[in-house]
A protein has these predicted regions:
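C-terminal ends and interior cores of transmembrane alpha-helices
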Residues: 101-117
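Intracellular juxtamembrane helix-capping segments at the cytosolic ends
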Residues: 129-144
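Interfacial helix-cap and linker-helix signal at transmembrane-aqueous boundaries
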Residues: 53-54, 85-87, 171-179
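Central cavity-lining transmembrane alpha-helices of secondary-active solute carriers
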Residues: 69-84
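Intracellular loop-helix junctions on the cytosolic face of multi-pass helical membrane proteins
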Residues: 2-26, 145, 173-349
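Helix-loop boundary and gating motifs at the non-cytosolic
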Residues: 24-72, 309, 318-331
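Loop-to-transmembrane helix entry/capping segments in MFS-fold secondary transporters
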Residues: 61-62, 145-157
Length: 349
């Protein structure tokens, strides 16, 4: 009888262990909804931006697309710096919260025409803090040997991204066009606000994921320093946006060859800066480690080169993908019949 009881206990324990092996961390739900609402707010605002600039602020088509291009380009650029600042100073969780708050402010600033550049600056910097740290925070939820659960977790995480991106144009886009532009932007802001509230309420479910040692995610005792960083970042991004808009009439006077030469010169300057900073960091690292240890091995260089090759194709893909918020939106607005199952009374006569 005792053997049967022991076997039953072992069977129950094995069943529970199997369930636990496939059960995702509770923190994944928090990140899932935070990312879903962030993507809802981003794609909701993106679906309205170009149409709002042209139909409400009387921008020309070229100027509206230029501003949209600047905004989108900086949205993809700032996560590099946001991720670096989070790794070195803030920690992922605090950077995530800072980015979320900035985006809430940015979306509601879109309701005021005079605050357009400030709104875009807040959204860009907020995205820079938020976007890289959500993805990496998902990975921090799992321990060693949980590669299978981590892979499944990322699949669930990307379902949240797709769900938010799917709902945004249907809800925020419809409100913006049919009711009023500011209602659409406010809808995106409300979505981001829900994401922030849900993120704050779910902090305990994330455990120590994304935190530095002895760090409290909602401790902003160094608020003055943080405000200085964030304020300087927003001001710098706003200056870039305004600068591009200010110099765009002169850029239009350049020929295509001159524009290409200017772009190549800027790219060369960036590469020189990166190589110079890399050589400086390499020399500092070399002075601190034995000569027998190379900072980057041959196999690591091969992986870096592979990443750069893949990155070239990714850039081409996202360049085409982001036309959905610009040229494709204008094409759909001007050349697409969006009425279904409409009966024309004239056709009956």
């Amino acid at each position: 009888m005792s053997d049967i009881k022991t076997a039953t206990n072992l069977s129950n324990q094995l069943t529970n262990d199997m369930k636990n092996d496939h059960r995702q961390p509770s923190g994944l739900k928090v990140i899932f909804f935070a990312e879903m609402w962030e993507r809802f707010s981003y794609y909701g605002m993106r679906s309205l931006l170009v149409l709002y600039l042209i139909n409400s602020l009387s921008y020309t088509r070229d100027n509206a697309l230029a501003l949209y291009g600047i905004y989108t380009g900086l949205v993809y650029l700032t996560p590099i710096y946001g991720g670096a600042i989070a790794d070195k100073y803030l920690g992922k969780r605090r950077a995530l919260l800072i980015g979320a708050f900035l985006m809430v402010l940015g979306h509601f600033c879109m309701a005021f025409e005079s605050l357009l550049y400030l709104a875009l600056g807040l959204l860009i910097v907020g995205n820079g803090f938020f976007k890289p740290n959500t993805s990496s925070l998902v990975g921090d939820l799992y321990g060693p040997g949980e590669e299978g659960k981590r892979s499944a977790g990322y699949s669930i995480f990307y379902m949240g991204i797709n769900l938010g991106a799917f709902l945004a144009p249907l809800i925020a886009g419809t409100l913006g066009e049919k009711v009023g532009w500011h209602y659409g932007f406010a809808c995106a802001g409300v979505g981001m606000t829900i994401g922030v509230i849900q993120l704050l309420m779910g902090q305990d479910k994330l455990g120590r994921a994304g935190l530095k040692e002895h760090q409290n995610p909602v401790d902003f005792s160094d608020a003055q320093l943080l405000l200085t960083w964030v304020g300087a970042s927003v001001a710098f991004v706003c200056a870039i946006i305004y600068g591009f808009q200010f110099f765009s009439p002169w850029l239009e006077l350049l020929s295509k060859t001159q524009k290409v030469m200017l772009e190549l010169s800027l790219l060369a300057g960036i590469l020189v800066y990166l190589l110079n900073s890399k050589s400086n960091s390499h020399s500092e690292a070399s002075s601190q480690i034995p000569e027998s240890h190379s900072p980057i091995s041959q196999s690591e260089w091969a992986r870096v080169i592979a990443i750069f090759i893949v990155m070239l194709f990714v850039i081409v893909f996202w360049t085409g993908f982001e036309q959905a918020g610009g040229t494709m939106t204008l094409f759909a607005d001007k050349n697409t019949d969006r009425e279904l199952f409409v009966c024309d009374p004239k056709s009956k006569h």
